[in-house]
């Protein structure tokens, strides 16, 4: 049993289109290869950058924004001047704890992720606190392939 539905080394994006609420999955490579940058931002109600912590069914959609799912990204959010949203806006993992959620523009977030080749938390990271049930991290103390707290 793999508690982490996105366990490979690719950032997944979930696109919720207004027409049918269908979830379309993209990778950054796909976006780059097909030059879908503007097309994605134009057609998308919501774009989620999923940092491999697993989101289950507990998605709270807000049209026109990107949700960064990791409080460990606070440093990056601050560094690149992406404003955190009000503290009462939360996004919860199914079976996990609520995590602070940051909202930035769709275009800026896709550009940021593309430039930095961002890859998020792995469920199997040693030394990362988990909830003891699913094996998923609490608040994403480490990031991989991104400049992070522990320098990995």
Swiss-Prot record:
It catalyses: a 1-acyl-sn-glycero-3-phosphocholine + H2O = sn-glycerol 3-phosphocholine + a fatty acid + H(+). One of its GO terms (cellular component) is host cell presynaptic membrane. GO terms for biological process: lipid catabolic process. Keywords: Hydrolase, Lipid degradation, Lipid metabolism, Neurotoxin, Presynaptic neurotoxin, Secreted, Toxin. Disulfide bonds: none annotated. Its EC number is 3.1.1.5. Expressed by the venom gland. GO terms for molecular function: lysophospholipase activity; toxin activity. The keyword Transmembrane does not apply. It is found in: Secreted. Neurotoxin of presynaptic effect which degrades lysophospholipids. This is Orientotoxin-1. It comes from Vespa orientalis (Oriental hornet). The lineage of its organism: Eukaryota, Metazoa, Ecdysozoa, Arthropoda, Hexapoda.
